Each structure stands twice: as structure tokens, then as C-alpha cells.
């Protein structure tokens, strides 16, 4: 197995990030008859102020990514806190999950957000999802719960 390299993402990575959204929401998508394409607002029109992505590669191939984006209150993400707090998404392809790549991505993205001057990051996670302990271990704290979905926030 080769070493994982984390690099800055750009517009050329958007098809990969878009494909990762199916994995991010796939663990509960079975409850729906069709895949909810409204989640694509997490990557559509990439390059706006406040967009930042990191891509994890292994042997030159992308295996995961983490990114954050600001959302307006009129079109919030699932983990929306306020218009000044970017919402984070972290996804590792299934074949590489459980190997610490997600933790590396979260740590690196927290550093990126702090360097960019943001006071916090938020994230949405389903209660009981494997990422919940990882996020709490990185200092994310619950700010809201709706049904089985948690909104977590990490001050930077």
C-alpha cells in the first residue's frame, strides 16, 4: 500500500467530489426511491468565495476528499449553523474507509479553515454513523439534533 498524499483540490476535482456525495448520503439513501440530487449544491458552481477542498490520493488516485463551503440562510446545507460558518463534507471511498484517511482529511481541513480565518466549521452527521466518534474526537460539539441527524460545530 502506498502513502496517502493530501493536496489542495480545485475545479478539476469537482466530478470526483460530486461522485463522493453518493457515498456520503448513500448509507441512508435506501429509504428513498430516487437519489436526492439537491445535495449537489455542496459542489455545484465550485469556486465561490469560501469554497475550499482537499483531496487524498494514494498512488496518484483520489481516495477521499474533504471540503467546506459557505451557504446562505436561504439555501442552507444540512449542517448549516450560520452564514459565517462553512459547512464541511468529508468522504473516503468505501475500499479505503477505516484506515485513518478521514481523520487526516478532517485535521488538514481544520487547519485550512483556521488559516483562512474562519472561526468554526460545522458538519451534519447521522447519529450512530461511523464518522460521529471521529468528529467528536476532533473537538466537534453538538449544536442541534433533528430526528436522527446531528449538526456539530468545531470552534477553530
Give residue ranges: language-model regions.
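A short beta-loop-alpha structural element at the N-terminal edge
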Residues: 3-19
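Helix-loop element at the rim of GNAT/NAT acetyltransferase active sites that forms part
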Residues: 19-35
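Active-site rim helix/loop that mediates acceptor-substrate recognition in acyltransferases
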Residues: 30-59
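Conserved acyl-donor/pantetheine-binding loop and adjacent beta-alpha core of acyl/acetyltransferases
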Residues: 57, 63-89
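C-terminal "cap" of GNAT-fold acetyltransferases
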Residues: 82-85, 125-130, 136-138, 144-156
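A short, internal acetyl-CoA/4′-phosphopantetheine-binding micro-motif in the GNAT/acyltransferase core
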Residues: 87-98, 125
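Conserved acetyl-CoA-binding loop-helix of GNAT-fold acetyltransferases
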Residues: 98-113, 136-137
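Conserved GNAT acetyl-CoA-binding A-motif
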Residues: 113-126
Amino acid at each position: 500500500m502506498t502513502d496517502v498524499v493530501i493536496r489542495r483540490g480545485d475545479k478539476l476535482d469537482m466530478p470526483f467530489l460530486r461522485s463522493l456525495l453518493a457515498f456520503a448520503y448513500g448509507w441512508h439513501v435506501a429509504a428513498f426511491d430516487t437519489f436526492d440530487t439537491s445535495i449537489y449544491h455542496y459542489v455545484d458552481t465550485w469556486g465561490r468565495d469560501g469554497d475550499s477542498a482537499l483531496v487524498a490520493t494514494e498512488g496518484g488516485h483520489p481516495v477521499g476528499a474533504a471540503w467546506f463551503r459557505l451557504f446562505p440562510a436561504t439555501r442552507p446545507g444540512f449542517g448549516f449553523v450560520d452564514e459565517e460558518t462553512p459547512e464541511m463534507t468529508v468522504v473516503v471511498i468505501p475500499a479505503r474507509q477505516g484506515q485513518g484517511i478521514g481523520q487526516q482529511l478532517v485535521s488538514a481541513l481544520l487547519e485550512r479553515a483556521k488559516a483562512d480565518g474562519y472561526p468554526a466549521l460545522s458538519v451534519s452527521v447521522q447519529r450512530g454513523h461511523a464518522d460521529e466518534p471521529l468528529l467528536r474526537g476532533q473537538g466537534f460539539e453538538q449544536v442541534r439534533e433533528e430526528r436522527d441527524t446531528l449538526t456539530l460545530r468545531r470552534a477553530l
